[in-house]
Amino acid sequence: MIKTDELRGEIAKNGLYQSDVAKMIGVTPKTFYEKMKNGVFGSDEIEIMIEELNIRDPMAIFFAKK
């Protein structure tokens, strides 16, 4: 399960909007919002976000326990 609040924080810390990250990972903003709502992203999408957002502790965000 993804910690969406922490991911939103990382997005904001980079001065970006969720729609910017949607474009980065190749989905529409609507699809991105749904993925955030459900807390589910593909491994390729996670990889891109880790790299593009310079996330230092991806385990804490993307591989959190419920």
Predicted regions and their residues:
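Short, basic-rich loop-to-helix N-cap that marks the start of a DNA-contacting helix
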Residues: N38-E51
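The DNA-recognition helices of helix-turn-helix-type DNA-binding domains
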Residues: T28, G39-V40, K65
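Short alpha-helical DNA-recognition segment
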Residues: G15-T31
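Short C-terminal boundary/hinge segments that cap the last helix of small helical domains
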Residues: N54-K66
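A short, Lys/Arg-rich alpha-helix, primarily the initiator
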Residues: M1-L16, D20
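Key DNA-contacting residues within the recognition helix of helix-turn-helix
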Residues: Y33-E34, F62
